[in-house]
A protein has these predicted regions:
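General structural signal for secondary-structure boundaries
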Residues: 1, 53, 74-76, 195-198
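C-terminal cap of thioredoxin/glutaredoxin-like
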Residues: 21-29, 113-212
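A generic fold-level signal
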Residues: 1, 90, 170-171
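Short, cysteine/histidine-rich loop/knuckle motifs that typically chelate Zn2+
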Residues: 16
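Extreme N-terminal starter segment of soluble prokaryotic enzymes
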Residues: 2-7
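Structural alpha/beta surface segment adjacent to cysteine/selenocysteine redox centers
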Residues: 19-119
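Short pre-active-site segment immediately N-terminal to redox-active cysteine/selenocysteine motifs
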Residues: 10-13
Length: 212
């Protein structure tokens, strides 16, 4: 039977995924490498071309306040406040896919770093240069990262992630799936945000059952 693992369907520019990032940290602390996490990009708004209106910015800022109230995480709307900002989630998602070539753990760390850059630091993570800066922070070589990020192969791989999400019936983010059990079946741990204690309880119960 394949090693039990988690599949995390997420998007770097999904505010509730940012809110869920401390939960993933708790999962890593609780289970370590006995329960590895594979990150799959869900595709929140890939290919968006129209700049945000001021009304849309206000609406999304309201959603961010809900996440902040629920999680206590910091928010800075500077990344979205720029004139002509296009909320295209594909560049950041593709960056995570490129980093994933270096390993799942690094991809997960890069996802978290990108979320923090956008939501807490107000940086424009639709920019390849910003995404490269973040990759360099984690030890990647800048030119190689940008070359891979701009490649047709990376674009195609990212859209395959979106297709996997759709095929799996994932309709919202974050979604966390665990599997396989003794019958080879995968099950949903949470659809949408859930507090750490709830998620850890579900996972501990699941791990105990498949180990029995």
């Amino acid at each position: 039977m394949p090693t039990p693992h988690l599949i995390y369907f997420a998007d770097p520019m999904c505010s509730w995924c940012y809110g869920f990032s401390p939960v993933l940290d708790d999962i890593r602390r609780a289970f370590g490498r006995t329960l590895p996490v594979r990150v799959v990009m869900g595709g929140l708004r890939p290919g968006t071309e129209t700049p945000m209106t001021e009304a849309a910015k206000l609406e999304i800022a309201g959603h961010w306040r809900h996440v902040q109230d629920a999680t206590g995480l910091p928010f800075d709307a500077g990344g979205m406040a720029r004139d002509g900002f296009v909320y295209d989630t594909d560049p950041a998602a593709r960056a995570v896919v490129v980093v994933r070539h270096e390993g799942e753990e690094l991809a997960s760390s890069y996802l978290t770093r990108t979320q923090r850059a956008f939501y807490a630091e107000g940086r424009d993570v639709t920019s390849g240069e910003v995404l490269a800066d973040l990759a360099v922070e984690l030890g990647l070589e800048r030119t190689r990262f940008l070359t891979e990020w701009a490649s047709e192969e990376a674009k195609a791989e990212t859209w395959r992630d979106y297709a996997i999400s759709q095929h799996a019936g994932v309709a919202g983010f974050p979604t966390l799936v665990a599997g396989p059990n003794e019958e080879g079946v995968y099950g949903v741990v949470t659809r949408g945000f859930a507090p750490p204690a709830q998620v850890l309880e579900v996972l501990k119960d699941w791990m105990a059952r498949i180990a029995a």
